[in-house]
């Protein structure tokens, strides 16, 4: 029995729930990426921080092209994510170069820096897979990439001090997509512990707990900033 076939009876009983969670995560993230593309070209600003974007694309590349997981639904969604993410990378670099940055070196070489950063993250996932195994890299690494994006998006919101380049739709789809996937992982850990019990560990619980905290904090700050911006518009009118 491996980690992707010959399901035990305990997991077979909840497998339909798991499939719904995977489909929910896939659809929510796909919608999130499409909305992100629209936001980038509408507001002419990066919607996703470059660090988390590179980490996320590297994970998708690793899953789709390097360590293909034998689960068709998951592979289809990952392939679609990767394609849309290429547009996000293009848009993010394009709008970033339209604005003058404090570091002219970074500003000038951004089209080179981003691909190198993605390759660096891919090599990190590859090294991790050689160290701890493919399933742990794909699923544990995916949770970590999601956590990095949550923290990075909150930092970007605080650094900008405005809702420019963000939206409630982006936040909601990211939250629903992330936690549908994480709940699915914990479901496997509980009902298929022989292969997936490793996921229910202190690090994964910490990542999940911290991500929930950051996402709630993000929503509160985003709402506050939105209210302040509306009030400012009212005063100008």
Curated annotation (Swiss-Prot):
Any one GO cellular component localisation term in the record = membrane
Enzyme class name = lyase
The topology of this chain with respect to the membrane is: Multi-pass membrane protein
Q: Which residues cross the membrane?
A: 17-37, 47-67, 71-91, 109-129, 138-158, 167-187, 206-226
Q: Provide the alphabetized UniProt keywords.
A: Lyase, Membrane, Transmembrane, Transmembrane helix
Give the catalysed reaction(s), semicolon-separated.
(S)-(2E,6E,10E)-epoxygeranylgeranyl-triacetate lactone = sartorypyrone F; (S)-(2E,6E,10E)-epoxygeranylgeranyl-triacetate lactone = sartorypyrone D
InterPro entries reported in the protein's UniProt record: PaxB-like
Molecular function via GO = lyase activity
Which pathway, per its entry? Secondary metabolite biosynthesis; terpenoid biosynthesis
Is Transmembrane helix set as a keyword in this record?
Answer: yes
Q: Does the keyword Protein biosynthesis apply?
A: no
Q: Per the record, what phenotype accompanies loss of this gene's function?
A: Accumulates 2 uncyclized prenylated polyketides, sartorypyrone E and poxygeranylgeranyl-triacetate lactone.
The record's function comment reads:
Terpene cyclase; part of the gene cluster that mediates the biosynthesis of meroterpenoids called sartorypyrones. Within the pathway, spyD catalyzes the cyclization of epoxygeranylgeranyl-triacetate lactone. SpyD exhibits promiscuous activity, resulting in the formation of bicyclic sartorypyrone F and monocyclic sartorypyrone D. The biosynthesis of sartorypyrones begins with the production of triacetic acid lactone (TAL) by the NR-PKS spyA using one molecule of acetyl-CoA and two molecules of malonyl-CoA.
The text of the family note is: Belongs to the paxB family.
UniProt protein name: Terpene cyclase spyD
Report which gene this protein is encoded by. spyD
